[in-house]
Swiss-Prot record:
Keywords: Endoplasmic reticulum, Glycoprotein, Lysosome, Membrane, Transmembrane, Transmembrane helix. The chain crosses the membrane at residues 100-120. This is Major intrinsically disordered NOTCH2-binding receptor 1-like. Belongs to the MINAR family. Coiled coil: none annotated. One of its GO terms (biological process) is cholesterol homeostasis.
Length: 125
């Protein structure tokens, strides 16, 4: 039977310390007191405007994130154009297939509606 009492002996402040604080590669990182920095923003709008590639934050915020150029502004992915062409061709094929299936179903329904009464009428005579 597994009980928590067995684990209580092994939980010490040393085992609760994060490994990153003990790692010498990260020893230069100072621990920032979050309580002191909550009231002071790390970036103001003017600082953000100076450091970003977009220049004016207000102009940048006017852009529509639903626009594809918003996300792919300076990014070029090789083969992206061909991928878009393949997707467009696939959507066109799907639309044609759906239209053809609808027309076929409609024709079958019309044929059944016309032939069933004729067959029933002939079988009565």
């Amino acid at each position: 039977m597994f009980e928590d009492k067995e684990l209580e002996k092994h939980i010490t402040p040393q085992t609760l310390k994060p490994k990153i604080k003990q790692n010498p590669l990260y020893s230069h990182i100072n621990i920032i007191q979050t309580e002191e920095n909550k009231s002071k923003p790390s970036w103001t709008i003017q600082d953000y405007d100076r450091h970003t590639s977009h220049g004016q934050l207000a102009d940048y915020m006017k852009e529509d994130p639903r626009d594809l150029s918003f996300w792919l502004e300076d990014l070029y992915t090789p083969g992206y154009d061909s991928l878009l062409k393949k997707k467009a061709a696939e959507m066109k094929r799907n639309k044609i297939c759906k239209t053809f299936a609808f027309i076929t179903l409609f024709v079958c329904a019309v044929v059944i509606i016309i032939t069933v009464p004729i067959v029933v009428k002939q079988s009565r005579d």
